[in-house]
C-alpha cells in the first residue's frame, strides 16, 4: 500500500527509487497533500500526525518543505491550478503580479520544475532488453 500523493510522487517525484515508490496499490496518488490531510481528519487520524510537518525522517529535524525549498501549498497551487491554465491565461496571470510577488512565484516555480526534471527518471519503469 503506497503513501505517495499527487504532489510528492505524481509531479515532484519526491520518493526513493525502489523504495517507498514501489507499491502495488496507490490509493492517494491523485490527491494533493492538503486533500490527504482532509481525508486523514475524516478518518480520525490523530492531530499529532495531521499537524506534524511532512518528513521523510531522513535525519533528525528534516522536513520535506525545507529539503525541497518550497511549500506543498505552492506545489498544489502550481500543479493543481497554474499548469492547467492555457499559455495565455498563465501569461495574463503572471503579468498581474507585482514585482515582489512575481519574483517569489518565479523562484518557487523554478524549484518545482527543477525537482520535477531531476526526478523524472523515477516515474519511468526499469529498462528491459527484451531479448527473449
What are the language-model segments listed below?
Residues 1-132:
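ATP/NTP-dependent adenylation/nucleotidyl-transfer catalytic domains that generate, transfer
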